[in-house]
């Protein structure tokens, strides 16, 4: 707690930061366009939990390209990579990672189709509340956990404005091929064949949306549940459905999502809940002078966890703010107030119950 108090006092003496920046156009000729974008996020966590305390600096670099094939057909691609800045040179680049890598074709008002490493369709709704200065988006949208966040081997069809007939009405369909990861360290990131859908409608700042996805689970995932059903889901299929509401106008941003998952949600890094009920809500206001305060509440409750019964997996209030110096430079502070109680469940499975304060300075282009 002493570290948290020091962190908050230090941050209170400084102002906070970050605004959406445009990518740098590096080529635009003969119907071919290439944009380069990137960011450096120099940040530090303060927490009584050693695993969540320390430097978490990283840099990201990516490009977006497109080529006009004819009046109705456009090709496009995107790649994004993350470089860790908190490792010694002797540790190499083992923690660096490819975030996005996909290519596709857009057929005018008939939509687009792409394939590669991209965002899962369930994140079309999850993204609405994943807007906090540092934390958030962690009750059910998890990277490489089926189609809830960034995912490997997804083929995606997207249609905006419903074939050009209804402004603001968008829908998507997605298929994910099997990725069999059998090592215990990454078995939660494996998946069988799966499909998903999403639909959103936005009008004058108001938005409503829903998503559904279902996938086969790998043999490793199913067998783990047969051995230890208290902490490993044993179902053969993973499912998620989610719905969301948002308002984004007049400098105000409000959003909330509710979702339920089956045999999908990961907790304490390695374990999978049989069922989880998840709720997220966020409110933000953008002042004209650059300050954007943020407050949020997030909760994920695991259901039917064997001898553990029903348990909170994630539960916290988040209070933070970002200050934008300009479109390229910003600073932030984010305070995650952990509401999980220390009990037999959290102690046995290593679920953190400590608060975290994050402080950062961001340059992006």
Swiss-Prot record:
Bilayer topology term: Multi-pass membrane protein
Source organism of the structure: Escherichia coli (strain K12)
Remaining remarks: Encoded by the cryptic lambdoid prophage DLP12.
Alphabetical list of PANTHER family matching this protein: OUTER MEMBRANE PORIN F-RELATED, PROTEIN YDDL-RELATED
Protein family per UniProt: Belongs to the Gram-negative porin family.
Subunit structure as annotated in this protein's UniProt entry: Homotrimer.
Tagged with keyword Electron transport: no
PROSITE patterns associated with the record: GRAM_NEG_PORIN
Keyword field: Cell outer membrane, Ion transport, Membrane, Porin, Signal, Transmembrane, Transmembrane beta strand, Transport
Listed SUPFAM superfamilies: Porins (SSF56935)
One GO MF term attached to the UniProt entry: porin activity
Primary location group: membrane
Signal sequence, start to end: 1-23
GO annotation (BP), single: monoatomic ion transmembrane transport
Localization annotation: Cell outer membrane
Name listed for the protein in its UniProt record: Putative outer membrane porin protein NmpC
One term under GO cellular component: cell outer membrane
InterPro entries: Gram-neg_bact_OMP, Gram_neg_porin_domain, Porin_dom_sf, Porin_gammaproteobac, Porin_Gram-ve, Porin_Gram-ve_CS
């Amino acid at each position: 707690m002493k570290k948290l108090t020091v962190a908050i006092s230090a941050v209170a003496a400084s102002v906070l930061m970050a605004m959406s920046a445009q990518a740098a156009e590096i080529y635009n000729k003969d119907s071919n366009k290439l944009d380069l974008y990137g960011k450096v996020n120099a940040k530090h966590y303060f927490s009584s939990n050693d695993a969540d305390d320390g430097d978490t600096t990283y840099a990201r670099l990516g490009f977006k390209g497109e080529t006009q094939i004819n009046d109705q057909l456009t090709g496009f691609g995107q790649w994004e990579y993350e470089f860790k800045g908190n490792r010694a040179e002797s540790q190499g680049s083992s923690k660096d990672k490819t975030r996005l890598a996909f290519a596709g074709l857009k057929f005018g008002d008939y939509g687009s189709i792409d394939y590669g490493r991209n965002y899962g369709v369930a994140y079309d709704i999850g993204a609405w509340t994943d807007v906090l200065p540092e934390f958030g988006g962690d009750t059910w949208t998890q990277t490489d956990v089926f189609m809830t966040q960034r995912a490997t081997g997804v083929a995606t069809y997207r249609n905006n404005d419903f074939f050009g007939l209804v402004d603001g009405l968008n829908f998507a369909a997605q298929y994910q091929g099997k990725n069999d990861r059998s090592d215990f360290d990454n078995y939660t990131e494996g998946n069988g064949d799966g499909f998903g859908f999403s639909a959103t409608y936005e009008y004058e700042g108001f938005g409503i949306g829903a998503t559904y996805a279902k996938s086969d689970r790998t043999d490793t995932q199913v067998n783990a549940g047969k051995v230890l059903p208290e902490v490993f889901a044993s179902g053969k299929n993973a499912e998620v459905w989610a719905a969301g509401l948002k308002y984004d106008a007049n400098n105000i941003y409000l959003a909330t999502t509710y979702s339920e998952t089956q045999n999908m949600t990961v907790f304490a890094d390695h374990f999978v809940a049989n069922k989880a009920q998840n709720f997220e809500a966020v409110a933000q206001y953008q002042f004209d002078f650059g300050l954007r305060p943020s407050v949020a509440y997030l909760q994920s409750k695991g259901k039917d966890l064997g001898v553990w019964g029903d348990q909170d997996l994630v539960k916290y209030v988040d209070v933070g703010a970002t200050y934008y110096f300009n479109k390229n430079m910003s600073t932030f502070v984010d305070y995650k107030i952990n509401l999980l109680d220390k009990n037999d469940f959290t102690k046995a499975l290593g679920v953190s119950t400590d608060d975290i304060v994050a402080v950062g300075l961001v340059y992006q282009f």
